[in-house]
């Protein structure tokens, strides 16, 4: 079997001589290595460029967190494991920046201790057990010094502190606690060792919160020299962060974006090729981590300018059936009558306006860092799927002049739509599409599906990176192929 992304990462770091260690949460390291997940790596600052070039060669991409800001010397990288098609998160530290969950308002001078005295365990460099225990107790107690941090800790572990205490018991193995006094004296001399051991026992025995809170305040006072910001500044930062966090959650957004910027990715193809399924799956997959928006460009919402006309046209088409054109992407033969041609042309212009408005909104989101996933995408190719519809009439006359004016206006609107950054063009044999259509809740006529596969052009975008994907394969295989294409495009 092909080595996992994490295995290749560890092998690469070792072969290139990058000085690093997995500096925290090592109680769950085996699970993280097996499933990918998140790795917390402390990397020596002089090796930063070497490390980043190594992970870039493995397909990792730098990501920024807009909500929590950019902590100095702390970065996020994400990579796609080819075996599982799941994301691997590297939380990379060039300084020991830690502390509370939200602010991480402390920077401890422990890099040398963790890196120079690390040991190799199952292919991963880990810090000395006593050093990891010492820092764990300090980090845990700092979370008790703030009511907000305490509530976050309680929310994440409603049954108490089982996970916290389980990690503590893991770190207490091999008599690591006995060496903490020596390490404190050498590396954090401001911390009283008796207070440290009292804090350790308070966590271990699940002391009442009032006692833990008081001990945490005392410890925090002794760590004043290691703060990144003053108490007043930290309070303002916390208030701002909580407000922004509430706003982003209300909007249903994630805070991480690719450092290289956002991207508009379009799924295009005939009927029953799996566009909607893949858009939904992709938005759900990337939306667990990134700021993602999805939209259907074939059926755009009305703008304030087109709301009433769209409503009026809908009523007219239902109330007066003979006004409907007999050839309106249905695949049925025949030509619309004069009045139907006018109604059809008006509807086409309004649809072009709405599609352009939606495409421009999505483009603005992408250039501001968001990943945009589109179900279909319009083009200026007349007659192509979900694209311009109207041809300029050859015949002359007042009536044809009006239709020609509408056609030119519609074509111009489509030319103003910016192309997507990447296109995934889905294909399946027509007989498979017909079969899939029959399995839908809302079925189209079989003739319509055949017509869309054989007689209607798929829009093309010369300036966009276009990849063809055959979706006539097992669902999981199609999804994994789409994920690899999308990750390469970001």
Walk through the language-model features, giving the residues of each.
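A glycine- and Lys/Arg-enriched "phosphate-lid" helix/loop adjacent to the NTP-binding pocket
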Residues: 376-455
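Conserved lysine of the Walker
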Residues: 275
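ATP-dependent small-molecule kinase phosphotransfer cores
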Residues: 300-398
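Hydrophobic positions on the alpha1 helix immediately C-terminal to the Walker A/P-loop
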Residues: 278
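P-loop (Walker A) phosphate-binding loop of NTP-binding proteins
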Residues: 269-270
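NTP-dependent small-molecule kinase module
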Residues: 209-211, 215-237, 430-490
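Conserved NTP-donor binding/palm subdomain of two-metal-ion nucleotidyltransferases/polymerases, i.e.
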Residues: 1-37, 43-263
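Short beta-strand-centered segment that lines the nucleotide-binding/catalytic pocket of NTP-utilizing
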Residues: 288-305
């Amino acid at each position: 079997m092909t080595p996992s992304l994490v295995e290749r990462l560890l092998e690469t770091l070792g072969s290139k001589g990058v000085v690093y260690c997995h500096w925290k949460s090592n109680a769950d390291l085996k699970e993280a290595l097996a499933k990918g997940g998140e790795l917390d790596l402390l990397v020596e600052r002089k090796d930063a460029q070497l490390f980043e070039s190594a992970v870039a060669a493995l397909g990792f991409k730098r990501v920024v967190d807009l909500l929590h800001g950019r902590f100095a010397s702390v970065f996020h990288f994400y990579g796609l494991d080819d075996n599982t098609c799941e994301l691997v998160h590297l939380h990379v530290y060039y300084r020991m920046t830690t502390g509370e969950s939200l602010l991480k308002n402390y920077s401890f001078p422990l890099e040398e201790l963790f890196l120079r005295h690390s040991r190799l365990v199952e292919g991963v460099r880990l810090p000395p057990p006593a050093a990891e225990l010492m820092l764990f107790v300090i980090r845990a107690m700092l979370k008790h010094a703030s009511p907000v941090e305490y509530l976050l800790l309680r929310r994440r572990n409603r049954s108490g502190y089982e996970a916290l205490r389980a990690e503590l018991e893991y770190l207490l193995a091999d008599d690591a606690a006995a060496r903490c006094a020596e390490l404190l004296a050498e590396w954090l001399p401001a911390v009283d060792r008796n207070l440290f051991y009292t804090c350790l026992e308070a966590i271990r025995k699940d002391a009442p919160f009032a006692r833990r809170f008081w001990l945490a305040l005392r410890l925090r006072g002794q760590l004043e020299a290691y703060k990144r910001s003053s108490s007043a500044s930290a309070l303002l930062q916390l208030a701002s962060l909580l407000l922004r966090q509430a706003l982003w959650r209300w909007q249903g957004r994630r805070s991480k974006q690719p450092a290289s910027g956002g991207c508009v990715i379009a799924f295009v193809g005939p009927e029953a090729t799996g566009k909607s399924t893949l858009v939904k799956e992709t938005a759900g997959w990337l939306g667990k981590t990134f700021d993602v928006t999805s939209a259907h460009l074939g059926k755009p919402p009305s703008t304030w300018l087109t709301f009433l006309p769209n409503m009026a046209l809908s009523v007219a088409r239902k109330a007066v059936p003979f006004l409907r054109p007999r050839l309106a992407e249905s695949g049925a033969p025949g030509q619309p009558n004069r009045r139907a041609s006018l109604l059809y042309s008006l509807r086409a212009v309004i649809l072009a306006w709405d599609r352009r408005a939606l495409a421009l909104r999505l483009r603005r989101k992408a250039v501001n860092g968001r990943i945009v996933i589109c179900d279909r995408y319009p083009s200026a190719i007349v007659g192509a799927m979900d694209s311009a519809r109207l041809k300029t009439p050859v015949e002359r006359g007042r009536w044809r002049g009006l239709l020609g004016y509408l056609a030119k206006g519609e074509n111009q609107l489509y030319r103003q739509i910016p192309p997507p950054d990447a296109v995934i063009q889905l294909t399946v044999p027509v007989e498979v599409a017909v079969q899939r259509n029959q399995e839908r809740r809302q079925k189209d006529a079989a003739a319509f599906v055949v017509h869309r596969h054989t007689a209607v052009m798929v829009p093309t975008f010369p300036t966009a990176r276009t990849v063809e994907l055959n979706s006539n394969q097992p669902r999981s295989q199609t999804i994994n192929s789409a994920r690899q294409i999308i990750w390469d495009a970001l």
